[in-house]
């Protein structure tokens, strides 16, 4: 046991030391989240996720699919429509012990002005201003399986990342995630998710014409060079419980804690070695067909108008409606504009095919 603890300690210390020389917020678009159901609960879903979105949140949850096949889609807009965020996923049960999933995530900003050729020979010509898009893509292949331990499931992701900014730069990356869930007979649920467990990398390649390089030089800007970007591991711990009031009404509550290892961040518990960012959520359902959700997260320390330190947070609410094989979810984030973030409307749809027969 002592040897095991020493190994864990060395891993954390090594990661923390490496964090001092690696950028924070690498591949940050992968931390936004997917599914309006999860957003409505403040993204506290690591321990309880049991549908197609588990491929993103915790692949171990794919084993708990209640259907042979599930499809899910989500679209949302950020910054008054400047940025678009899209998600699509497919999951299927291979048998009673194994499941497979595929997820695609896209975050894009379109219509970015390219002003490198705005000034030529001292003359400004707006007709030479063009536009380009900056897009980030992630492709996740997920696998989950039950273990010999009753209630314990394991899962993992292999993910490929592609990022592009116009004709100027492209990047390809590769990473691995691993997750586990444990559910007890008295309806307690526990989960752990290790993202970028092998330190995901992005290999960036830049391409500029000689004329564009001259503009960088004349404006005293550094010309970007091909480089390798590393995303350090992050860990999410979750615990929750199901409550059944009667045959009609049920409740679910969960709390998660995100642990970052890429250096000090502005979160509730912050240090140069690791950071703790908690979030929690609740869900009430009626006949497993109508759902009401609420959650809170993104705790940050900020200075108010009086230059006093305060803690801000982001409250979310959501609803869900199940219509046969169709599940509709909606979430409104940052209710009352409590945090510095702008509120967003989230819509997602889930479609089930070939519902499995359950024993009575």
Placement of each model-derived feature along the sequence:
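Sec/Tat signal peptide C-region and signal peptidase I cleavage site
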Residues: 15-19
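Subset of outer-membrane beta-barrel
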Residues: 20-360
């Amino acid at each position: 046991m002592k040897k095991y603890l020493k190994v864990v300690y060395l891993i954390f210390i090594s990661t923390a030391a490496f964090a001092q020389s690696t950028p924070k917020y690498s591949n940050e678009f992968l931390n936004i989240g997917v599914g309006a159901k999860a957003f409505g609960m403040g993204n506290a879903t690591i321990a309880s996720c049991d549908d197609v979105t588990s491929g993103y949140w915790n692949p171990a949850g794919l084993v708990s699919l209640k259907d042979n096949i599930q499809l899910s889609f989500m679209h949302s807009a950020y910054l008054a429509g400047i940025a678009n965020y899209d998600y699509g996923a497919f999951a299927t049960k291979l048998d009673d012990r194994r499941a497979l999933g595929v997820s695609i995530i896209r975050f894009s900003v379109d219509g970015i002005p390219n002003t490198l050729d705005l000034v030529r020979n001292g003359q400004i010509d707006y007709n030479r201003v063009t536009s380009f898009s900056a897009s980030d893509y992630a492709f996740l292949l997920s696998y989950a399986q039950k273990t010999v331990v009753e209630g314990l499931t394991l899962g993992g992701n292999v993910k490929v990342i592609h990022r592009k900014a116009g004709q100027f730069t492209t990047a390809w990356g590769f990473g691995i995630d691993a997750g586990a869930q444990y559910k007890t007979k008295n309806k307690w649920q526990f989960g752990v998710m290790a993202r970028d467990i092998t330190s995901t990398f992005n290999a960036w390649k830049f391409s500029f014409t000689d004329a564009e390089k001259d503009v960088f030089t004349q404006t005293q800007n550094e010309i970007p060079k091909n480089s390798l970007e590393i995303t350090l591991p992050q860990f999410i711990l979750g615990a929750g419980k199901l409550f059944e009031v009667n045959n009609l009404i049920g409740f679910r509550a969960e709390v998660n804690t995100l642990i970052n290892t890429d250096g000090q961040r502005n979160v509730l518990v912050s240090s140069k070695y690791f950071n703790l960012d908690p979030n929690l959520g609740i869900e009430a359902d009626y006949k497993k067909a109508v759902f009401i959700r609420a959650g809170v997260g993104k705790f940050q320390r900020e200075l108010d108008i009086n230059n006093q330190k305060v803690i801000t947070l982001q409250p979310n609410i959501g609803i869900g409606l199940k219509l046969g094989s169709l599940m509709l979810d909606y979430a409104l984030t940052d209710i009352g504009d409590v945090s510095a973030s702008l509120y967003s409307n989230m819509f997602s749809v889930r479609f089930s095919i070939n519902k499995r027969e359950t024993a009575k």
